[in-house]
Amino acid sequence: MSNEATVIKVTGQSVNENYDVVVGRGLLDTLPAKLGERVRRVLVIHPRALRLTGDTVRDELEAAGFTALTAEIPDAEEGKHIQVAAFCWQVLGQNDFTRSDAIVAVGGGAVTDLAGFVAATWLRGVKVIHMPTSLLGMVDASVGGKTGINTAEGKNLVGSFHPPAAVLADLDTLQTLPKNELISGMAEVIKCGFIADPAILDLVEKNTDAVMDPGSDVVRELIERAISVKADVVSQDLKESGLREILNYGHTLGHAIELVERYSWRHGAAVSVGMMFAAELSRSVGRLSDADADRHRTILESLGLPITYRRDRWQGLLDGMRRDKKSRGDLLRFVVLDGVAKPGILEVPDTSLLFAAYQEIAS
């Protein structure tokens, strides 16, 4: 595959919803141009684990003539709290950031979620550019304009829609990504295969070894295909009024697992179990064939992703699912499949149906 950057366009209903997702290598030197001439001050938000990377981005911006600062936040989901957002707001205020200044997020999905939320709320909206450093961040969190923080009541219950000005997915950053993080991100890639692009599933099934090599052409193609799926969906439905709900395949139970586990589970692992549950639910109501449901099990297991969860946690999971944003009143709603790349919605008035499907994945 070519070393040239691939540009995937996200288009929306207004000019502020249009942006490029750039996939390639050595993309840091393109950041100043993406920020534009009007920006003077830039806050680089990064997690503790990426302090050196954050400093490198800051130094690059300083060399290009920007006034650049860094804000270091806790790693992973620990960074997605209102207190962390308040810390970032304080830094912005103390350094006189105006509406024409910008934020750059450097890190995984949790960092882009938090930085996007800070950008959306500071002065009711400033420019943000995402530089995702994890597979999960590249294919999911950084694309689509969703921002959010967690509360004691659940994940991403507080947030807004705030599309970035650009996303720079630098594949070089994946070279140092821990294997379990790579596997976690693959769950979101697989999700895109099941809801929209069967070629993703074929690639994974035929190239299991290459899928675990972040430098391979296969991984790059998987990333570009997954981003293209999400870009196409959010271009049609930014604010999740209809079509965008399909991107939540596996997430209703997945988010409930994360809540029950107090966010100690990786997002992709929880979504993997959630997809297996959704497949069993789809099968149980006659919407998904045995072969397609079993294909979930085979593909997810081949990557080392979990497909079962504890039998004794059902009530806690049910409570968590009732807080899902797709719910309408007391009615639980799930993204299900009528076949590969044929997503739909199932409204479930009777939780006994859910319990029966859960027994198929309970351990």
Swiss-Prot record:
Cofactor annotation: Co(2+); Zn(2+); NAD(+)
One GO-annotated biological process of the protein: amino acid biosynthetic process
Compartment(s): Cytoplasm
Residues engaged in binding Zn(2+): E188, H251, H267
Top EC group: lyase
Keyword Transcription regulation set for record: no
Chain residues that bind NAD(+): 75-80, 109-113, 133-134, 146, 155, 173-176
InterPro entries, alphabetized: Dehydroquinate_synthase (IPR050071), DHQ_synth_AroB (IPR016037), DHQ_synth_fam (IPR030963), DHQS/DOIS_N (IPR030960), DHQS_C (IPR056179)
GO CC annotations, alphabetized: cytoplasm
Entry keywords, A to Z: Amino-acid biosynthesis, Aromatic amino acid biosynthesis, Cobalt, Cytoplasm, Lyase, Metal-binding, NAD, Nucleotide-binding, Zinc
Tagged with keyword Lyase: yes
Catalytic activity: 7-phospho-2-dehydro-3-deoxy-D-arabino-heptonate = 3-dehydroquinate + phosphate
E.C. numbers: 4.2.3.4
UniProt pathway: Metabolic intermediate biosynthesis; chorismate biosynthesis; chorismate from D-erythrose 4-phosphate and phosphoenolpyruvate: step 2/7
Family per similarity comment: Belongs to the sugar phosphate cyclases superfamily. Dehydroquinate synthase family.
Its job: Catalyzes the conversion of 3-deoxy-D-arabino-heptulosonate 7-phosphate (DAHP) to dehydroquinate (DHQ).
The protein's name in its UniProt record: 3-dehydroquinate synthase
Natural source organism: Paenarthrobacter aurescens (strain TC1)
